[in-house]
């Protein structure tokens, strides 16, 4: 993580924690975030943490070395965006088409509590944050992980295989090299500690459809980056996040282009969207 997202983890009495202790801390964090996950998902989150810890020295995935710190600064940090994103990605809010192509979930099913989006692109996924975490939480959402560093992309593919995440696709390339199409029509594009906001939105221009939600995970609100946005881009919302066990600022920034402004709101009020709201909306967390 960059220096702008430096943090102090609130220390537990023991510096060395086994899987059982990590599971208890994860459960406590999920409760604080008002997230209810099935046991299988919790198990996969812990399995992913084990992979991240095991292969970190080989792939240089993160500067965080201690498993409990990884749990807080990576897993819980990524999980903190699940509820606010799910609230904005229910079927009424992303009905219709993106980039001219119908959205399809991992199994071609409509979005629900475990699939508030049909297609997500995680830009600069690194060690899989937040993309792998979202793939575990949203098993019916197609997740595209974009990571140009070959060894990190190899780790992401290994995670997808070992965690049985068949709905994950890894792109060992720069995001600018991706082209939208029927298999890549994102209704959510996001990044975490990836680049400046101007560089981020510049790279994703070709993938952004009229109703695509664009989000960036940041620590302290980057006022200089916001002021430097061009091309009709602006920050529509700044959502403060509270990550369990972490003494640090976290924010989720939602961005929009002036040309697309109001598109998502209009889709919310579309008769077809209202008709599907009760059936496909996300579960309360």
Give the label of every model feature segment.
Residues 127-140:
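Conserved SAM-binding loop of SAM-dependent methyltransferases across substrates and taxa
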Residues 91-93, 116-126:
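Conserved class I S-adenosyl-L-methionine
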Residues 2-114, 151-152, 158-166, 274-279, ...:
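Class I SAM-dependent transferase core
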Residues 105-106, 111, 125, 134, ...:
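Residue-level detector of alpha-helical hydrophobic segments embedded in or interacting with membranes
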């Amino acid at each position: 993580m960059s220096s702008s997202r430096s943090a102090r983890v609130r220390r537990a009495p023991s510096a060395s924690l086994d899987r059982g202790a990590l599971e208890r801390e994860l459960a406590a964090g999920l409760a604080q975030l008002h997230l209810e996950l099935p046991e299988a998902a919790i198990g996969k989150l812990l399995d992913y943490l084990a992979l991240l810890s095991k292969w970190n020295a080989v792939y240089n995935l993160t500067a965080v070395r201690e498993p409990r710190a990884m749990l807080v600064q990576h897993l819980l940090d990524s999980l903190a965006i699940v509820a606010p994103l799910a609230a904005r990605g229910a079927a009424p809010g992303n009905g219709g088409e993106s980039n001219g192509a119908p959205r399809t979930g991992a199994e071609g099913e409509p979005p629900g509590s475990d699939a508030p989006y049909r297609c997500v692109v995680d830009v600069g996924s690194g060690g899989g944050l937040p993309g792998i975490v979202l793939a575990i939480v949203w098993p019916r959402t197609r997740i595209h992980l974009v990571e140009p560093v070959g060894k990190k992309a190899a780790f992401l593919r290994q995670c997808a295989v070992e965690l049985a995440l068949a709905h994950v696709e890894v792109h060992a390339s720069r995001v600018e090299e991706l082209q939208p199409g029927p298999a890549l029509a994102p209704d959510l594009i996001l990044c975490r500690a990836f680049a400046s906001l101007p560089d981020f939105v510049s790279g994703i221009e070709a993938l952004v459809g009229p109703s695509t939600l664009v989000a960036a995970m940041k620590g302290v609100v980057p006022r200089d980056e916001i002021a430097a946005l061009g091309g009709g881009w602006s920050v529509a919302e700044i959502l403060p996040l509270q990550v369990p066990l972490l003494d640090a600022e976290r924010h989720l920034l939602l961005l929009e282009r002036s040309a697309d402004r109001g598109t998502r709101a209009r889709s919310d009020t579309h008769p077809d969207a209202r008709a599907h709201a009760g059936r496909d909306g996300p579960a309360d967390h």
